[in-house]
């Protein structure tokens, strides 16, 4: 969220009046927000009051109540970040010469925007989408709405939770949750709120939560819909996680922390408990007739796209009834719904389930209606199949690189060459690799420690997730080393871990997020610089991301914890000869040689992450 404090400075010919502070989070959806219908009584020289405002594109229009007491005034509107940094002045000049209250209207181009990602910085890009929230000295009102354009999401780091399994409202860490029972275990929005310090302590700037809409209530052959993917009514909430007030409170608390909210949604299907022939369509809303769904057929041929899009997922325990998204009425209903969903619950981004099961031309108008960042699940490792979906959605989950990453690091001596090849392939196949969702685990895939218990291999795979191209996504429990395999074992309750903030992987993930966030803070072109491989061999890959002076060099290996100690010499790092760089995981200083080569001390198969010493000063990284 873009958290901004505006203040109105009133400059008089004779004296300077006190500053009147108003706290905003702006959006650009052209909605007029009324603050005061008439001026409030004031004390002292508080003679400027905001009556209404709207942000339309980059134009701020507003009306002010201004009171003059025998001297002219020029009212200038500035903005101030929450950390106290003054942003660009908005060009508003109001000469006032009457001796009473007057309502002045004005319009100005917002010359800048403020993005808060840990540390504040001024961003000259005014094309971003803002959110409105208002806390004035004399009156209070609020309108909670979305913020997250694709450009803003690039710099985020996402912590994914299965809402039911992350944290309970009562804070219990002993409540029993047997994954094989497949029942609701009591995780909630309030539970997440209570644990945001835990999440933010790892450096995350966004969370992704389970689908929020009402699901079928039945105890099916696969248990209950605790995961949220078995829709029944898209206009109602799944109250097992909490009510509307709880969800809004979660969004508000995230936004107060400068964090974003991503919500998982399903468009492709509704669910039924029982045989496909017995589906009761009247139970669904808003599509309460069979006319809105594809005729029954199971998906049997994934090489046939028509079969993939128009036939049904699931089985006769839980058939997933396929919505006919080719119908204009369905398209318009979904577009209207997603706008309302986002506005009602202050959603900043969407993860979209089963994207490849909906015809591709559905997605561009849907994303336009949403108006925020969307990342689609295209469950396929072939970039020639997956990447074209980025023509219609901002991003897709990076399954093409997920499989080579697992292959490279799940065992000693895995295939590094396949990973190198895929990194290069994606640059030509995908429209923008920096908007892909980079992940190692999720609710649909086995946890990485189910493949290996070797901490060095696990650390290398996590480092790739966070420091390569794309928006990093860490699945809840990775920081505690959870090791469940396929569904349902990868959907464990987190609370038995006690939410340790001193575990090996908690501290490790925090360090990686910290250096990434710092590189973005120093120069946000780090985000659009495409990661490239500067060295590889059968056991090692070294990557550079970031322009000269702000580049992170990441060196990964699959030698495992028993790997020997040796020195790897790297060229093409872009580091200046004789400059000092820090390996930020061990806080070791290394001097680049006269030829610009970097001597990398490798040991125990552990990853190495380098950054220029000169850019670390004041960061707190390695006590700098």
From Swiss-Prot:
Pfam families: A_amylase_dom_C, Alpha-amylase. Residues 1-28 form the signal peptide. Substrate binds at residues 230, 269, 351, 356-357, 381, 444, 491. The record marks 444 as: Transition state stabilizer. One of its GO terms (molecular function) is calcium ion binding. Its EC number is 3.2.1.1. Disulfide bonds join 177-185, 297-311, 387-430, 587-622. Its main location: secreted. It comes from the Eukaryota. It is an enzyme of class 3 (hydrolase). Ca(2+) 1 binds at residues 268, 309, 322, 357. Residues 40-133 form the CBM21 domain. Keywords: Calcium, Carbohydrate metabolism, Disulfide bond, Glycoprotein, Glycosidase, Hydrolase, Metal-binding, Secreted, Signal. Glycans are attached at residues 304, 344. It is found in: Secreted. Ca(2+) 2 binds at residues 353, 377. Binds 2 calcium ions per subunit. Calcium is inhibitory at high concentrations. InterPro entries: A-amylase-like (IPR013777), A_amylase_C_dom (IPR015340), CBM21_dom (IPR005036), Glyco_hydro_13_cat_dom (IPR006047), Glyco_hydro_b (IPR013780), Glycoside_hydrolase_SF (IPR017853). Gene3D superfamilies: Glycosidases (3.20.20.80), Golgi alpha-mannosidase II (2.60.40.1180). The active site is at 353 (nucleophile), 377 (proton donor). The keyword Signal applies. GO terms for cellular component: extracellular region. This is Alpha-amylase 1. It comes from Lipomyces kononenkoae.
